[in-house]
């Protein structure tokens, strides 16, 4: 768990009952994918990577729950900490060098790896990947 810099904290709030339930299940069954949602879209036209990244950074900047991290250890009651920015939530992988026949399998494997990479609620519960 990364120590938070107070200058990066926008707000600290109590958990809602729904968030308490999510944290309960997260701690009780750490290998569960109960709250994991993965969406995969195929875009047939060119994607301007910098614009894609800028757009997602904007989405995260105006949706504080996407910048939320949980803290429950060493505090009286679990807390939700809203960060000013969410670092490293974007991942870009260029798969264009893969043979066309292998590309779908390669991307499917990347999606499987992403699904297997469990979220640490202390670090955030949101990420975006772009496979070109």
Question: Which positions does each model-derived feature cover?
Answer:
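Short, charged, solvent-exposed linker or helix-capping segments at domain edges/interfaces
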Residues: 91-92, 104
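Short, charged/polar, Gly/Pro-enriched secondary-structure boundary elements
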Residues: 85-91
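Acyl-group handoff/entry surfaces in thioester-processing enzymes
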Residues: 5-84, 97-132
